[in-house]
């Protein structure tokens, strides 16, 4: 816990100020199934993994590349070297995800597709944490630039994918610092999972 606090106070990575929040939400969920889509160095893996150990959950971290700094090598953790869309396509539909952290490829079509899959894999007690709705130093404002037509931020990026969700079924709020950490929740649909 001390290392998470130190990174949250003194860290200069683009998600360091969210590490305690990620840990607290995963811990409070008391869920059993955590997934992390996008790993890079493994900075956000650490709070998810530490919470998973404490509540007896399992964390699946998914990325095309191996983590460069933090990768647990014991129980409660599985690293999957795969595209996140393929991973979600293969996830058992009857296995509810309690906590999902989404921070990999940020293009609008990619994030929209992730959310379409997650819609079937989460229930009303699940949370989806999304990083970078305020990327590029736009915080505390959402990054709504539609001028990127190619690459990672194409077509409106993650903000557009979230902003287009039907508010009748979804609610969300964003912590407005360090590129934003959005907390997304499916309100009441029990079409796939009751809790």
Put a short name on every predicted segment:
Residues 1-101, 105-195:
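A short alpha-helical cap/connector motif
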